[in-house]
Structure formats: C-alpha cells, structure tokens
C-alpha cells in the first residue's frame, strides 16, 4: 500500500468525498427527524433534539451544509489544479526524455532494474504523486498459466490534465448552482407547500416542504460525477455512472406528485437503461479478453507500444506505434497456440503482453499468440468483438448524453427544478457520456469512431431544428443541450479530441448560465415558463437579461466568447476530415448549417423574453429581478462564459482572435490528447489546420445569417413568424412534434409492449391460472373422494376390526366370573380338549 499521505493527488480524492459527507450528514439528520417526529410533542427532551435537527421547518441549514461541502471541494480542486500544473510540465518533459533515450540508446535499457537513471526515478515519483489504487476484489481467471489474469476490481484515482480541468469545472459550476438554489428553492422552506400543478378533490395538493431533501440529493449528484471523473478504471466509472442515473431520477421526479414529473423521471431512467445494456456488453467483452478494467492497461495492450528492444516498433518498414495491429489466425492443431499473420484487414486484433522483460521484440509478420496467455505472451481478440466492445460503451454514452436515437428523455427532464436542469445539462449527467468517449478514445476502432461522428451529426441537426419552434424557455435550452452534445460527439468521431472536450468545458459554463438565467426569469415571473407570455422584461430584470445575452453570444460562437474557440475548432476538424474523406462531407455540412440555426433559436429566445412589448400584462406587472443569491452566480458564470478559453499573452502580444491558441485547448492537446488521435487522423488534422481561417469565416457568415433572421422576425418585426407557420404548416407541425420520435417509439415499442403485456396478463389469467385452478379443483375433487374412501372404507374396516375385538373381549369377560368352581371346570375342559388333540395327532402320525 503506497504512502497516501505524500500524494498531492489526494486533494482530488478529498474534493470527491466532501459532497458525500454533506449527503451523509443531511441523510442522518433527516432520518433522526423522521424517527423523533412522533415523540417530539410528548417529550420535552426529544423535542429539544428534534428542534436542534431542524424541526418541522428545517430552514436553510441543509443548504449551507451542502454549499459548504461543494465549496470546499472547489477549493481543494483549485489547489490541486495549481499544484498539478507545477508538476505536469516537468513530468511531460521527463517522459519524452526517457522515450528518446530508449529510441537512441536502446542497449542502455537491457536491464532497467539495474540502470535506472535519475530521470526515471524522478518521473516515477511525479507520476505516482497523481495516482493511487487498491485492489477491492479479484475474480481469478480459469487460465492457470496466468494466475494474475482475472477481473481486477480496483478503487483508485489517476489525475491528468483532463481530470484536473473537469474537476475545476464541475466543482465551480456545482457551487454556483448550490448558491443559486438557496434562493430558487425558497418555496420549499414552508412547512406546508401548496402545489398548484396538482389538483385533488379538496383543491390544490398540499405537502411538506422538501428543502433539505433537495440539497441532500444535489450533494449526492455532485459526488457521483466527481467520482466518475476521478477514477482510473471502468468498473468504478460504471458504479458512478449508475449513481448519476439514480440521482437524476430522484431530482427529475422531485415533484413526484405531478404526473408529468413522475413520467419524465421514469422515461429518463428507462431510456438510460437501454444504453446501459450496451455498456454492460462492452464491459463483459473487455473483462473477458483483457482481464482488467484499468484504462491504461487496456490501452497499452490493444494499441502497439512505442518502442521495443530495437528502440522502435516497425511493421513493413513503417512505424506501428499506437496503432491496432490486425491479422488472420492460423490455428495450430492440438496446441494451445495460434499463428497470426499480420494483415491490415485481418479479422483479429493483437493483444500485447501485459509484462515485457529483457530483449522484448515487437510483433513480426507471423506472430505466435496463446489461446491461454501468460503475462508475457501475446493474445488476440476477434476484431468484430473489439468493434462490439467500443459500440457497447458508446451505446451507454448515447443514453447518458441524450444522443440519437435515445435523445427523447432529456427535454422531458425539464420537469425537475431548474437548478437540477442546470446541473444535469452543464456539469454532470449529460457531460458524463462525452467525457467517457474522450477517456476511452484509444479503445475505439475506425468503425466505431465513424459511428460516433454520424450519431453526433444527426443529433446536432435534429435537436437544433426542434429548438426553433419551442416556446417553453427551458425546452429551448434542453434541445440546445442535445444539439451541443452532438457537436462534441461529432468532433470526437472525426479526430477532434481536443476540440470536443474543450467544447464540453466551455459549454458547461454558458449552458449553466443560460439555465440559471431561465430559472431567474421563471422565478421572477412566478414560475411562468411560456415565452409567449413574456416579452419586455429587460427593464425589470437587467442583470438576468445581460448575463443571459452573454450566454447566447457564447453558444452562438461569436468571436472573443468562449464558445467561439471550441466551436471553430470543431468545424475546422470536421472540414479537415471531410476533405480527406469526401464521401462523408455531410459531417461538415450539418454542423455548419446548424451553427446558423443555433444562433437563430438562441437569439429568438432572448428577444421573445426580454424585448418588445409585454404579451401578458399580468406576468409583466408581477415580474421582478431575482435576489443576490441568484444573480451573483449569473455574473460569475457570465465572466467564465467570456474568458475561460482565452489564449494566454505571449511574446507577440495577446492573440485573442486566434481560436487555435486557446490556453485551455493547448493544455488539453499538449498534455492529454491520446497519441492514437495523431496516428488515426494525421492527414485530416493537417488539413483542418491549413483551412482553419476559411472555415472560421464560413462559420461567421452562417452565424450572421442566423442572427439577421432572428432580428428581423423577433426584434424588428419586419417578418411575421406566424406567416411562416401558415405557409409551412406541415414543417411546423413536424418540428413541434419533435420529428415524431415519441410517437414512433410509442407505435413501435411502447404500445406493442403494452399489448404484449396485456396479452401475457390475459394468458396468465386465462391459461396458466386457468390450468392451475383446474388442477386445484381436481385436487379438491380427489381430496373429497379420498376423504370419503378413507372415512368409509379404510376407517370403516379399522373400526370393524375394533368392534369385533371389542365384542370378543366383552364375551371373554364373561369367563372371568371370580368363582373357583368355574375355573376348575374350565381347566378340566381344557385338559380334555388338549388330550383329544394329542390323541388325534398321534393317531394321524401312526396311520401315516
């Protein structure tokens, strides 16, 4: 067990555990209040403890506990991030120095255990500072040759640049959402809350306030996401993955008395289980062929290592580092080995040894792989299973990040409180899917990556078109999130690893800003969400309006705002890929067009909410700016929405207008981007860099068109949107019905499922239960006849024997007279009888 106290990486572990500590405290307090409530009125001592724990109305105590936990987590993350930055540069330089030494002077590393350089020792110390794990459970393999090859379930952490910046983003955004929630959820502070959305026979529903419960769930949600980011293995990710799903279910269905909220929670949970089914299949394949869930071990065994004994691995005189090595199997009859002939289109992928010692050579044109490999032997996996493993993991990400065709749950998730929507859409649940795709990138084959790209492209376009016609302010943002997640997936699929994850980070800030801004509007308008009843709110809600405008500019990709740096990189990467693979030009065209659509519907939302004349005077007259606990988070998020991706000043000045020099993007690219990206997409990345300026100008032109249309329709009123609806009623209906995905799934899955369920119930009731009832009646019938037979025949015969015995006994009782002369007479008669018998017997014998 390593000396954990010397690991600065433990700051991130502490940051992860603080929210779960808040959850534990709130859970224990709630449980004690529940247990003490029945006795509080009867006993003064119990009542004192009950009041100490919050009493009937808990007040803001739970919010402060939850806020303290996540705020301290942010502080730990900030300190850890700064500390990591001071060491990552040295660690990166040492790594390249060691690799260079092995390439140039391979003979020096024949016996590394005897010739460790100072650089190697220093590198090991720095690397171990930021990782640690312990074995939680091991399921041993049945393959006796490698006793270590089994399912090793570790609990551990590994900090790299992606982990560090994700921690900063999640803890900061979650802290601001917690602060915002203190004001937004104030209605839940009442002992009795009247829910105007739920009607009963006695009027509106009345229930207890759930202020403490909300912050308890929020803390658990934050912990689940932080643990998912922290871990170094798929097993721990899957546990956190399911925890995130449970928390989303609890928070989306927070107002569970409302049918719409209950249905939305169920829908989110069920749709995500569909994706998780694929995730589990992927995990099982990885477990079977790799014997571990550790990311680094999987990646180093499925991708060709960088160096061998000769200093560099070459196949067909070409550098093979960081590539999949494929081939065809030639089984050896009666042996546990198979020969693999290397072939770029082979049906098998080589799995490299877990341990390489001494004079280790890379794969040759005909490599021997074991069917039951030891730690130092090659193995193999059918290529189609490797593809299936990647698709399975991606299927889980499709569900979690609401990608086509499992995007239907996310808009319905708006039934939860608005701060929950902000947390789900910005920093936790939907971010988890994109994060996992980025983390598992070296595992994905070209077929899987192309699938990811097309799924992202379809999603971003479909969701954007639906957002154009939405009138619920939260629904607009929901479809916007689905669309932006599609951008991230598209980028990852075409080799834009850095751009996709940079957009994940920038999107978190401006989407949290937009959702909290919409929450401020809803709160100020007394829970009105329909934009058709808003308008002209700018004078009354200036802080909310200005900060939301900053969010709109960022998501539209206006230069100098954070979204511009990441979205420009995505479009450039898509263009580079399309230029090298012209049959996939749609992968550039769709995101380019959608950039204009995004600008249109986001400015449409802002204009309809804050400009023009009030469309509902009752809403307008009662609207007001939100309290400081809600506006301060908006201001902080607005600042980050502008500058989080800015480049750092250099010797030439401050290149703010150079999207390729984003500081955050540079750090991710330089210290974290997998080498597999450069190998798989070398020419596409070069083309993207060469054409970045042209693509950027194209994108700005499309954004300008979107802004112009939104202004003409909803600000200046030159064009009438109602006329467009009348001219294209079919298109409007199609988009309003969300491309009929819900209806399609209802027709193909839900209704047939219900019909089958009813048929099964009918079959069970009429056939199975009927057969069981028939057997029961038959058993009842036979039991009755059995009872009669038992009573009449068996018991009758037994009773007859008893009666006969009883009669004989009674008769024999007459013999017992008690007189001596009677006994002498019986003895005499007995003697005569015996003599007669003996005489007859003797006569018979004599005659014989």
List where the protein language model places each region.
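Alpha-helical transmembrane segments and their helix-start/interface "positive-inside/aromatic belt" motifs
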Residues: 10-16, 57-73, 266-279, 539-549, ...
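Transmembrane helix-loop-helix hairpins at membrane boundaries of multipass inner-membrane proteins
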Residues: 1-6, 10, 31-212, 216, ...
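Aromatic-capped, Gly/Pro-kinked transmembrane alpha-helices
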Residues: 90, 112-161, 650-701, 712-848
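Hydrophobic transmembrane alpha-helices and their helix-loop junctions in integral membrane proteins
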Residues: 175-237, 246-625, 646
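Membrane-interface interhelical loops and short amphipathic "cap" helices
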Residues: 1-11, 53-54, 85-98, 114, ...
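Generic start-of-chain signal for non-secretory N-termini
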Residues: 1-25, 33, 116, 835, ...
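Hydrophobic alpha-helical membrane-insertion segments
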Residues: 68-88, 275-290, 548-559, 633-660, ...
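Membrane-entry segments of alpha-helical transmembrane domains in multi-pass membrane proteins
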Residues: 2-21, 57-68, 151-170, 210-217, ...
């Amino acid at each position: 067990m390593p000396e954990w106290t010397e690991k600065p990486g433990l700051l991130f572990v502490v940051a992860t555990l603080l929210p779960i500590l808040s959850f534990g405290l709130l859970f224990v307090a709630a449980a004690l209040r529940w247990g003490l409530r029945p006795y509080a009125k009867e006993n003064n001592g119990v009542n004192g403890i009950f009041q100490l724990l919050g009493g009937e109305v808990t007040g803001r105590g739970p919010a402060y506990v939850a806020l303290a936990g996540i705020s301290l987590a942010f502080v730990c993350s900030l300190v850890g991030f700064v500390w990591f930055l001071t060491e990552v540069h040295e660690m990166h330089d040492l790594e390249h120095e060691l690799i260079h030494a092995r390439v140039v002077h391979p003979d020096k590393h024949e016996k590394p255990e005897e010739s460790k350089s100072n650089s190697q020792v220093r590198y090991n110390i720095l690397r171990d500072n930021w990782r640690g794990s312990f074995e939680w459970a091991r399921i041993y393999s049945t393959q006796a040759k490698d006793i270590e090859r089994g399912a090793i379930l570790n609990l551990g952490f590994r900090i790299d640049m992606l982990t560090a910046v994700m921690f900063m983003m999640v803890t900061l955004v979650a802290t601001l959402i917690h602060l915002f929630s203190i004001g937004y959820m104030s209605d839940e502070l009442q002992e009795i809350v009247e829910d105007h959305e739920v009607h009963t026979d006695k009027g509106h529903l009345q229930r207890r306030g759930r202020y403490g419960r909300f912050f308890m769930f929020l803390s658990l949600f934050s912990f689940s996401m932080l643990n998912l980011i922290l871990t170094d293995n798929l097993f721990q990710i899957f546990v956190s993955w399911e925890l995130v799903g449970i928390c989303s279910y609890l928070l989306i269905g927070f107002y569970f008395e409302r049918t719409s909220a209950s249905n939305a929670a169920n829908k989110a949970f069920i749709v995500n289980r569909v994706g998780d089914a694929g995730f589990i299949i992927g995990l099982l394949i990885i477990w079977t062929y790799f014997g571990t869930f550790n990311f680094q071990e999987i990646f180093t065994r499925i991708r060709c290592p960088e160096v061998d004994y000769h200093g560099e691995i070459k196949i067909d005189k070409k550098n093979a580092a960081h590539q999949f090595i494929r081939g065809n199997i030639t089984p050896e009859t009666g042996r546990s080995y198979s020969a693999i002939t290397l072939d770029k289109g082979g049906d098998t992928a080589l799995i490299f040894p877990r341990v390489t010692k001494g004079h280790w050579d890379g794969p040759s044109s005909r490599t021997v792989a074991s069917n039951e490999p030891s730690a130092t032997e090659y193995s193999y996996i059918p290529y189609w299973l490797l593809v299936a493993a990647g698709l399975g993991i991606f299927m889980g990400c499709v569900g979690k990040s609401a990608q086509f065709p499992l995007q239907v749950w996310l808009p319905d998730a708006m039934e939860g409180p608005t701060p929950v929507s902000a947390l789900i859409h910005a920093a936790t649940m939907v971010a988890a899917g994109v994060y996992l795709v980025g983390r598992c990138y070296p595992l994905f084959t070209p077929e899987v990556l192309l699938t990811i790209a097309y799924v992202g492209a379809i999603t971003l376009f479909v969701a954007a078109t639906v957002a154009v016609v939405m009138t619920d302010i939260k629904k607009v943002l929901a479809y916007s999130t689905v669309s932006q997640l599609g951008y991230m997936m598209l980028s990852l699929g075409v080799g834009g690893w850095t751009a996709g994850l940079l957009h994940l980070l920038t999107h978190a800030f401006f989407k949290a800003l937009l959702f909290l801004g919409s929450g401020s509007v809803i709160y100020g308008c007394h829970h009105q969400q329909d934009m058709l009843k808003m308008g002209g709110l700018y004078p009354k809600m200036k802080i909310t309006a200005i900060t939301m405008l900053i969010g709109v500019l960022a998501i539209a990709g206006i230069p100098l705002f954070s979204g511009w740096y990441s979205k420009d990189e995505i479009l450039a990467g898509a263009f580079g890929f399309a230029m090298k693979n012209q049959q996939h030009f749609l992968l550039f065209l769709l995101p380019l067009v959608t950039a204009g659509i995004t600008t249109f519907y986001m400015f449409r939302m802002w204009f309809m909410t804050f400009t023009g004349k009030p469309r509902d005077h009752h809403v307008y007259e009662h609207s007001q700016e939100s309290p400081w606990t809600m506006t301060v988070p908006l201001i902080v998020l607005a600042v980050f929405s502008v500058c989080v991706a800015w480049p750092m000043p250099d010797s030439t000045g401050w290149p703010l207008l150079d999207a390729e020099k984003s500081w955050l993007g540079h750090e991710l690219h330089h210290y974290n981007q997998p080498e597999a990206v450069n190998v798989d997409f070398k020419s596409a990345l070069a083309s993207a860099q060469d054409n970045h300026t042209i693509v950027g100008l194209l994108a700005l032109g499309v954004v300008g068109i979107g802004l112009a249309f939104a202004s003409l329709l909803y600000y200046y009123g030159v064009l009438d949107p109602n006329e467009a609806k009348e001219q294209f009623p079919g298109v409007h209906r199609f988009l309003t019905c969300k491309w009929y995905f819900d209806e399609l799934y209802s027709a193909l899955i839900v209704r047939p499922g219900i019909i089958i369920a009813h048929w099964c119930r009918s079959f069970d009731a009429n056939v199975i239960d009927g057969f069981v009832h028939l057997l029961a009646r038959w058993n009842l019938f036979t039991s009755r006849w059995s009872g009669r037979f038992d009573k009449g025949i068996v018991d009758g015969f037994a009773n007859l024997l008893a009666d006969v015995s009883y009669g004989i006994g009674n008769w024999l009782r007459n013999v017992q007279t008690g007189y001596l002369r009677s006994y002498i007479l019986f003895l005499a008669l007995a003697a005569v009888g015996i003599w007669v018998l003996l005489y007859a017997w003797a006569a018979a014998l004599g005659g014989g």
